[in-house]
Amino acid sequence: LPLVVANFMRGGPGGGSIQPAQSDYWQATKAMGNGGYKMIVVSPGTLQEAVDLTYKAFELAERDRNPVMILADGCIGAMMEPVTLPEMKSDEQLEKEKQARKNWLVNGFKHREIGPVNIDLWGGRTSMLAMEAIAAGEKPGPRGLEESNRVSGELYERWAKEDTMVELYKMEDAEYVITGYGTAGRVAKSAVDALRAEGVKVGMIRPIIVFPFPYDAYKALDPKKIKFILDVEMAIPGQMVEDVKFAIQDRIPIHQFGRSGGNIVGREEIIAAFKAL
């Protein structure tokens, strides 16, 4: 079934603060839950982006019949900005979408018949063998479960090819790269502008969908041109930096700067960390 979950990260670990942080990245992108399932994870950097990505999250969840996570931080959850909402859908559009849901939506009433189950909705074959076992009052066996996992794997591979989203900012002539996501990425963007004003050729890579991670954006960097990468996060130790390292494979030096415990990373701090390298 489609599901959208919003995670507004706060300072941790354990019973930490309710201030902004980015300490749940690993949990959201690497350890989503038992059984090895995965989900698309979007991470807005502005309120407008939060609005747009929320709509997109529901579309993706319904498309794949799979959970989608909105991974934001306390800044996004607490601040106010003007936003533009998409146009209202017509009654005809709403009715068309409603009809499309009839092949998976259960009504919750025992005395009503459950509508036809479309086993082809999710990745094609899905767990037909498992469903047959359940219908017969049996537990799904290894054969059906393995088939389900294999089809899921095909879905995840398709995400990696078709569902990445990343912002490349002033990267055309960049000799240095600052990277970050969410609020840290937004602040990093202002640091890039300030450094550019000083004549430093620096650009930014900001993942907007953090799972699947946009590895290709980093793999495309020319090690003969880029002198180093500075990863900026509101997490100590850094977490997204591990994905950056995996993409770069030691071809370019990578450094990490972070704040934690509910402290919001600042533009001047990023600039100071950059100049110290």
Where in the sequence are the language-model features?
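Buried hydrophobic positions in well-ordered alpha/beta secondary-structure cores of metabolic enzymes
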Residues: 3, 57, 178, 206, ...
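Conformationally flexible catalytic loops at phosphate/diphosphate-handling active centers
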Residues: 65-167
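Redox- and metal-dependent alpha/beta enzyme cores, enriched for Fe-S-associated oxidoreductases
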Residues: 164-201, 205, 211-217
